[in-house]
Amino acid sequence: MHTQSIPDARYLQALTQSEPYLRERPEAMCEAETAMLERVVALFSDYSYENLSKNVTEVYAEKTYFRDAFKQFESAEAIRKYMLAGLEPLEDAEFVFNRFASNGGDYYLDWTMRLDFKKTPTGTWEESIGVTHMRFNSEGKIIFHQDYWDPTDIVYRRIPIAKQLIAFVKGKM
């Protein structure tokens, strides 16, 4: 597993290669920009096998950079497979987008992730908040996706030894 807080070479290269000044981009809040963001919201708001199978490669560019708390990928197909595999332990999943901000081709989406795990009673939702930094190519597809969220809130505390260790560390802080 990697840590998302250390800017490794692949992250720095993707950040440099996706600089907004290197490509045409839509004007702020124009129809094209709104359409880009609506595609992202539609993809994550219906976080189902059918929707992800069909639309991940429509929203992400073929060559893209994706990094979250667990994995790092550089293709839309790898992202699609990762997202589909992530559904296996879940009864249901949803993302609620709270707000977004943009600055010169950089987009920041503030979200709440809600997961209902199969091993818990149905309707027992685990929630976590996060922010995603995105950049888009001139076709309106994602070429850079960096998630910032704390997996201890929702995933690691489901593992007994990790739960105890996290509680101990938080108690010492």
Where are these regions (language model features)?
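Hydrophobic alpha-helical core bundles mediating ligand binding, dimerization, or RNAP-core interactions
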Residues: 40-44, 60, 83, 113, ...
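A solvent-exposed, acidic/Ser-Thr-rich amphipathic alpha-helical stretch
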Residues: 53-104
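Generic detector of well-ordered alpha-helical segments enriched in charged/polar residues
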Residues: 34-41, 57, 80, 84, ...
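A beta-strand edge to alpha-helix "cap/lid" segment located at domain peripheries
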Residues: 2-26, 88-94, 101-173
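Short, low-complexity N-terminal intrinsically disordered segments enriched in polar/charged residues
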Residues: 1-54, 58
